[in-house]
Amino acid sequence: MSKPFKLNSAFKPSGDQPEAIRRLEEGLEDGLAHQTLLGVTGSGKTFTIANVIADLQRPTMVLAPNKTLAAQLYGEMKEFFPDNAVEYFVSYYDYYQPEAYVPSSDTFIEKDASVNEHIEQMRLSATKALLERRDVVVVASVSAIYGLGDPDLYLKMMLHLTVGMIIDQRAILRRLAELQYTRNDQAFQRGTFRVRGEVIDIFPAESDDIALRVELFDEEVERLSLFDPLTGQVESTIQRYTIYPKTHYVTPRERIVQAMEEIKDELVDRRRIMQENNKLLEEQRLTQRTQFDLEMMNELGYCSGIENYSRYLSGRGPGEPPPTLFDYLPADGLLVVDESHVTIPQIGGMFRGDRARKETLVEYGFRLPSALDNRPLKFEEFEALAPQTIYVSATPGNYELEKSGGEVVDQVVRPTGLLDPIIEVRPVATQVDDLLSEIRLRAAINERVLVTTLTKRMAEDLTEYLEEHGERVRYLHSDIDTVERMEIIRDLRLGEFDVLVGINLLREGLDMPEVSLVAILDADKEGFLRSERSLIQTIGRAARNVNGKAILYGDKITPSMAKAIGETERRREKQQLYNEEHGIVPQGLNKKVVDILALGQNIAKTKAKGKGKSRAAAKSGVVEMDMTPKALQQKIHELEGQMMQHAQNLEFEEAAEIRDQLHQLRELFIAAS
């Protein structure tokens, strides 16, 4: 199943990349646990990491600070490794309200969640790839430090089928039910199976477009074949197949029975303590809720909120870390922490917020104390589990620098020859009028401007002022969700407007080559929005344009400003020197607007062609590229309905055509899901 990593790129490493690749590989081979890659905006950090992965041939997990950047990295890695397993592992909740209790108003909030099925399938595909092969790159968000099913139990539950094996039909159906597959002879979809005589069709939970047909003769498996679940066309016959559980949380029956006894013992102890403390209402509430859960587990093998009993189900002791995605990563795996100055503090903060909420639930009798062990990893547990790690950032934090022993791999020179922006400091008194004249200069030559302010009020007032003076301006603030944010960035790049105003504005990761000016108002107000790292990240947004410039408005130069200006000038000098020595003329980036959202777009087309079904990809490609993420979501629902209708009418050609369109649309939508 595994293949060697094969890097697919028209470019060879250039600029600082060859040296960075060499130093990182040497460090990994010498056994260094921590290394830091300081790569400026637009220097090709992802390409450098892809080269390291391809050269060392090691399974890799890439941690990103949010879904948007994870989606962008997933798209890039898919293009670099089209023949290998590039997987995507982020939270599968479109909406999630954890259960909580507010003592002051005596309000209990039930858990409420909406699961994105496509992302759930991709998570299952990610763990399957890690268990089966070595040529795997998993792009994950901080979701990777949250509890997942125990890999040992997960492996125990798998159903192995081989041609010629002796097994009766009822045994297969019983095993499928234990894996939480449901029988559905009408609507054949992911995580279901259907039975027709001695033929069992199974739609694997981790698969998007292929199903398994098991043909029995008496009690022997006569034939195994993979087929298209939509058209019924057989793709290939195989000798063996492994069916993985429908969720990561399946548990063998004997483990559930054992866990139930342990839960009963804990309930007895907890009831005694509550009665001694005269907490009779809480004791009655806890007894009722726990006994209901136990009855559900006894009858069905699971219950709502079963994750709260995960300590017993995975056989852990009190306080032990939960199994996570890190337990699925091989021992010689590699961890890459992207935008580490943001991701590392995030990992540290997850445990404390979760703990505070659960302690209230335990205290007031909604949960047993063992529910506290259903939690994300503590930071020290993450450190203990993490394999050899490369931290990637334009502005590494103190933690990464300390762990790397101050040794930083510099990647300052860009392959395109682009220089860091010129920085000017101008007085605050005339900042708004000065900014207006600068905006007009940029708008006249079809370039864009980013403006960052300190407060929401100032951002609103500035937007209003610029609009009154005839400028095309939009305002980005924290109330805007991911989908709208992507739309605004897209519209800025397309030239629907010229100026984007924000507060903690668009720092990490997103590429906007059209932006030639970044204006930072009140740059001399020392604080987290005007720290050295914040300033360098914000200035870096203009580093993808040949005419890149940053204007810092301030009446004095603060220590943070001095450091940010000093670091930017150091980089600019190094870049200029390299360009002069090698005769390089800086070139602007012509990055297509769709690239922000187009995840593995070309891969989806290639995959479709490989199956002889590319006819729809070409037809639909043009339409979808101009659609907003909101429209994409509506289009997906609409097309799914059409596809099922065609399949019911036995119009398989049309159904397959729509299915190929859906492949592309879903890839595009991941960024906004």
UniProtKB/Swiss-Prot annotation:
Q: Which residue ranges does the record assign to the Helicase C-terminal domain?
A: 431-597
- Residues noted as binding ATP in the record, renumbered to the chain: G39, V40, T41, G42, S43, G44, K45, T46
* Molecular function as annotated in GO: ATP binding; ATP hydrolysis activity; DNA binding; excinuclease ABC activity; helicase activity
> What's in the keyword line of the UniProt record?
ATP-binding, Cytoplasm, DNA damage, DNA excision, DNA repair, Excision nuclease, Helicase, Hydrolase, Nucleotide-binding, SOS response
Question: SUPFAM superfamilies annotated for this entry?
Answer: C-terminal UvrC-binding domain of UvrB, P-loop containing nucleoside triphosphate hydrolases
Give the residue ranges of motif Beta-hairpin.
Answer: 92-115
Its annotated compartments are: Cytoplasm
What's an example GO BP annotation here? SOS response
Record-annotated Helicase ATP-binding domain positions = 26-183
Q: Where is the UVR domain?
A: 633-668
Looking at the keywords, is Secreted present? Answer: no
Q: Name one GO cellular component term.
A: cytoplasm
Record note on domains: The beta-hairpin motif is involved in DNA binding.
Q: Which HAMAP family match?
A: UvrB
Assembly and partners are described as: Forms a heterotetramer with UvrA during the search for lesions. Interacts with UvrC in an incision complex.
Its function?
The UvrABC repair system catalyzes the recognition and processing of DNA lesions. A damage recognition complex composed of 2 UvrA and 2 UvrB subunits scans DNA for abnormalities. Upon binding of the UvrA(2)B(2) complex to a putative damaged site, the DNA wraps around one UvrB monomer. DNA wrap is dependent on ATP binding by UvrB and probably causes local melting of the DNA helix, facilitating insertion of UvrB beta-hairpin between the DNA strands. Then UvrB probes one DNA strand for the presence of a lesion.
Q: What family is reported?
A: Belongs to the UvrB family.
Name the UniProt record assigns to this protein: UvrABC system protein B
